[in-house]
C-alpha cells in the first residue's frame, strides 16, 4: 500500500506541474500577441523617419558633410551587443545566442581585433562574467516587451562608446524570429550606420493565430511606398544638422526593432518548451497511471489469495 501511495503522490505532483507549464504557455502566447501589436504600432514612425532620412541624403549626396555616425575608420576594437533573456525555461534560446556571441568573439580575435561586450539580459551577463570576459555595460530587468526608452538608453551607451573612439564598430548579436519552432542567432553591424540602408523600409511582421486548436504564426512581407520629400521643401535648419540629429534616432529605432524581435523569439521558445513539457507530463501521467493500476491489481490479487488460503486453512 505504501508503494501505491507513492505512485498516487507522484501522479498528483506531475499533474500540478502540468498546470504550471500550461499556464506559462498561455502567458507567453498572450505576450507574443502584445509584441506583435507593438511592432505594428511603431511602423508609421519608422516609415516616416525613413522618408525624411532618404530625402536628406538625396539633398546632401553631392556635399562633403561630416557625419561621425556614417564614417568608417580603421577597426581595432569591436563592441558586441548581445541580447539574451533574464530567465530560463525557454529551451535553447539563451544558450544559442551566447554560443553565437562566443563564436563571433573568436572570429574577431583571429583577425587580431579586440572586443568588448555590452550585455542585454541576465543570462548572458552571468555567463560572460563567470568567464571573466571584458564587459563594458550590462542591462537586465528590461520589460519582456521592450520599450522605446529602454532602446534609447542602450543606444546612448553605444553612441558614447563609438563617438569617443573606445570602439570602432558596434555589432549586434540577437535572435531573429523565424517561427514558433525556429529562430536564428544572427550578427549585424549597428555602427557605423550604412548610408545605403537608411531608407530601407521593407519589413516582415508576424501574427500569432490559432488553427485547429493550436497556435501558429503567419508571416507577412510588407513593402512601404516611401514617397520622396517635395523638392521645394525648405528646411529651417541646415539639412546636415537635421540629418546628424536624426541618425541617433534611427539607431534607437533599429535597436528597438531588434529587441522586439529577440523578445518574440524568447516568448516563442518559451511557448514551445512549455508545450513540450505539458505533453511530456501527459505522457508521464499515463505511464504512472498504468503502473498504479497494475500495482493495485496485484495488491487486490494478493489479498484475494491470502483470503482464499486462510479459508482453506480453516476448512482443512
UniProtKB/Swiss-Prot annotation:
Tell me which domain of life the UniProt entry assigns to the organism this sequence originates from.
Answer: Bacteria
Q: Where are the transmembrane segments?
A: none
One GO MF annotation is: proton-transporting ATP synthase activity, rotational mechanism
**Main localization, broad class:** membrane
List, alphabetically, the Gene3D superfamilies matched.
3.40.1380.10, ATP synthase, gamma subunit, helix hairpin domain (1.10.287.80)
Question: Where is the protein found, in the record's own terms?
Answer: Cellular thylakoid membrane
The topology of this chain with respect to the membrane is: Peripheral membrane protein
Q: Keywords, A to Z?
A: ATP synthesis, CF(1), Hydrogen ion transport, Ion transport, Membrane, Thylakoid, Transport
Provide the Gene Ontology terms for cellular component. plasma membrane-derived thylakoid membrane; proton-transporting ATP synthase complex
* Oligomeric form and interacting partners: F-type ATPases have 2 components, CF(1) - the catalytic core - and CF(0) - the membrane proton channel. CF(1) has five subunits: alpha(3), beta(3), gamma(1), delta(1), epsilon(1). CF(0) has three main subunits: a, b and c.
| Similarity-based family | Belongs to the ATPase gamma chain family.
UniProt xrefs under HAMAP family: ATP_synth_gamma_bact
Function noted in UniProt: Produces ATP from ADP in the presence of a proton gradient across the membrane. The gamma chain is believed to be important in regulating ATPase activity and the flow of protons through the CF(0) complex.
| UniProt xrefs under NCBIfam families | ATPsyn_F1gamma, PRK05621.1-2
Protein name as it appears in the record: ATP synthase gamma chain
Organism expressing this protein natively: Synechococcus elongatus (strain ATCC 33912 / PCC 7942 / FACHB-805)
Gene assigned in the entry: atpG
Amino acid at each position: 500500500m505504501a508503494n501505491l501511495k507513492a505512485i498516487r503522490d507522484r501522479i498528483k505532483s506531475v499533474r500540478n506541474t502540468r498546470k504550471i507549464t500550461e499556464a506559462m504557455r498561455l502567458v507567453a502566447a498572450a505576450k507574443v500577441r502584445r509584441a506583435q501589436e507593438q511592432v505594428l504600432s511603431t511602423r508609421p514612425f519608422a516609415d516616416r523617419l525613413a522618408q525624411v532620412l532618404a530625402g536628406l541624403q538625396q539633398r546632401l549626396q553631392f556635399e562633403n558633410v561630416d557625419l561621425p555616425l556614417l564614417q568608417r575608420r580603421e577597426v581595432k576594437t569591436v563592441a558586441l551587443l548581445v541580447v539574451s533573456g533574464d530567465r530560463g525555461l525557454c529551451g535553447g534560446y539563451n544558450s544559442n545566442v551566447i554560443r553565437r556571441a562566443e563564436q563571433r568573439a573568436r572570429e574577431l580575435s583571429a583577425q587580431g581585433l579586440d572586443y568588448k561586450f555590452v550585455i542585454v539580459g541576465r543570462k548572458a551577463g552571468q555567463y560572460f562574467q563567470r568567464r571573466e570576459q571584458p564587459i563594458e555595460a550590462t542591462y537586465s530587468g528590461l520589460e519582456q516587451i521592450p520599450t522605446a526608452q529602454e532602446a534609447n538608453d542602450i543606444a546612448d551607451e553605444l553612441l558614447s562608446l563609438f563617438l569617443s573612439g573606445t570602439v570602432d564598430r558596434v555589432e549586434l548579436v540577437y535572435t531573429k524570429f523565424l517561427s514558433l519552432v525556429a529562430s536564428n542567432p544572427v550578427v549585424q553591424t549597428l555602427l557605423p550606420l550604412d548610408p545605403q540602408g537608411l531608407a530601407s523600409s521593407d519589413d516582415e511582421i508576424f501574427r500569432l493565430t490559432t488553427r485547429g486548436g493550436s497556435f501558429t504564426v503567419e508571416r507577412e512581407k510588407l513593402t512601404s511606398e516611401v514617397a520622396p520629400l517635395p523638392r521645394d521643401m525648405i528646411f529651417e535648419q541646415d539639412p546636415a544638422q537635421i540629418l546628424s540629429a536624426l541618425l541617433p534616432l534611427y539607431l534607437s529605432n533599429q535597436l528597438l526593432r531588434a529587441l522586439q524581435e529577440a523578445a518574440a523569439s524568447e516568448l516563442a521558445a518559451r511557448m514551445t518548451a512549455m508545450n513540450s513539457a505539458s505533453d511530456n507530463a501527459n505522457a508521464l501521467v499515463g505511464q504512472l497511471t498504468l503502473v498504479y493500476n497494475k500495482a493495485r491489481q496485484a495488491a487486490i490479487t494478493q489479498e484475494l489469495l491470502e483470503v482464499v488460503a486462510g479459508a482453506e486453512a480453516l476448512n482443512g
